[in-house]
Amino acid sequence: MMRTAKLHGAAFFLTLLVSVTLVSSSLASSDMSPERQTTMEAEISAFQSGIDALGHDWIAGETSRMRMTPEERRATLMHDLEPFNGDVGIPYVMTEDRSGDRSLLDWRNNGGNFVTGIQDQGSCGSCWVFGAVAALESAFLFAIDGGDVVNLNMSEQYPLSCISNGWGCGGGWGQNVLNYARNSGMLDDDCMPYQESDTVPCGDHCSDTQYRDYYYGNYGVVCYTANTTSIKNALLNYGPLYTTMDIYENFNSY
């Protein structure tokens, strides 16, 4: 059965040039070498000193990303891309002002569950794919009023392997994934499981794709630079968004 959804609800906004999808690393503290443990603790201490000096009130700590080496962290980021050119013919999305004084919105429990589970991009810098696919999944759940697809999980490997105008594990822009979903559809993860590699052939998927495709309509952009009001309105009107964000080193310890 072919599944279809209009992607009017997956508007995205683009901000700065580095994007990150936090990963759930299986590397526990006990698996690190004593040298790596010492280095990590020194990094966290230095981050905390900087946080305190600026008068901020959050505490740096051990996270899955802090357990990575600096080289491993860098490999998961979009770090060498050319600046994004916003003038690429993507229509702006006008959003109704519905934010009011609302300070909390959880699309996991807002008349249904419209958010899929946390994923792990591993050592591949494929955050640009994971963020966009998560928005596509939420758009599909919106189209069917949420929660009616058990364990919805679309394939990140499919666009990672098949999109030619990206840099694979070296990064890319999420609108390329949205374009691909609109023009070619999406497959589920069982049909083409994620392998943390951009060398997997595009055709290395299940044979019965005609029965497990997801097709989408158009998408739009909310803003290219951060605009809090527009983003809040878009979250209320359209649901979860694809975004990029600029990060600093201490973000890894948050």
Residue ranges and their predicted role:
Residues 11-21:
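Bacterial N-terminal signal peptides
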Residues 2, 20-23:
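Short hydrophobic transmembrane-like helices used for membrane targeting/insertion
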